[in-house]
Amino acid sequence: MMKKRKRKVSKENVALTISSSVGEYGENSGTLPTDLMVEILSRVPAKSAARFRCVSNDWNSLLRSPYLTNLFLKRSSARPHLLITFQAEGKWSFFSSPEYLISDQNSNLVVVDNHMDVPKDYSFGVCVPVCGLMCTSNEWVLSRKRDARMMICNPSTGQFKSLPKVRSCRGNVITYIGYNPIEKQYKVLCMTIREKPFKFKAEEHQVLTLGTGKLKWRMLECSVDHYPYYHGSICINGVLFYLAMKSESKEYMTVSFHMKDENFMFIPNQDLLSTLINYKGRLGGIRHKSFGFMDGGDVGFELWILDVVNQEWIRSIHVLPPMWKDVVGETRVYFVGIIGSCEVVFSPFVKSNPFYIFHLDMKSNSITRVEIKGTGPLEGQAVYTFVNHIENVNLIM
């Protein structure tokens, strides 16, 4: 008869006792020091770490400890993922794969893993993920329902949480998520949008801090009337950036929102940028002839890098390789972001079967079509693709 021993944490020896059994082969038991368990758990996939919480209360406590969650996030930052999501069959599905597989010159195929599914009643477009968490990008605009729920989710652990209703007398609400690495704090910025003839601007700016117990929106002051675009946000070193237009002058600009101080700053743009990117830790922007998309007919794009000291943009032009036309063809793609040192990822707007993304090595100026397998045979759905996604085991509180 095999006798099971319970798992327990020995407070005296600070060691985790692993389940053992006693039988005809004798006793087989052992303890692992907590620091060794932390080392092991910080290296497993986030999906596995989330499941390990069910092993026991002691494992759950260990996996929720700030030291382990911070160590996991630090190590996960060195192994970023490609993240893909779309809505189909009554749910939103999330898929990911290690990013380095896209850069593999010996393979044109990447198999993704299904992380989680979210019920369809969470109607949303999604913001760029920040340190492992994602947020709805807007309420009502996509769903056309005033009762559409906004949410925050962690694709790696499968956890999602509703956000409080936004206090608003307007119809449309747009949101962004940011992270302050110093205080290790997530915040969600939202604003209501007024859209009248010749009168476009954001009003009722509000912010919500995660991990503070009861979630609550707080009103903010913003000194410049502007209209934010529904795309192109990025968070770099505790500063959230998003594209916008001044309400009165119709001038293009980039708005920066500092997570710690909760204040807005405004950076003039010389032209309308298609999207914002993280370029080696600096704010970058992309501009091309067709706002929002590119296809095989494009011959190049402009890369804009912000000079932080002078608050000016530095422009460079990248000419696409001749084979771009044949590889991309008539597929409409958008600039997802930069991985590695100088590798660009492009993605279609709509899911196809088979589904492909495109990898441009800016150093060698070579373009590769990469097939993504594992997302199923569905096609025709709007698809959201992200790079530099970091797995995170932190619970949404």
UniProtKB/Swiss-Prot annotation:
Domain F-box: 26-75
Gene3D superfamilies: 1.20.1280.50
Alphabetized CDD domains for the sequence: F-box_AtFBW1-like
Alphabetized SUPFAM superfamilies for the sequence: F-box domain
Record-linked InterPro entries: F-box-assoc_dom_typ3, F-box-assoc_interact_dom, F-box-like_dom_sf, F-box_dom
Source organism, top-level taxon: Eukaryota
Disulphide bridges: none
Pfam family, one: FBA_3
Protein name as annotated: F-box protein At3g49450
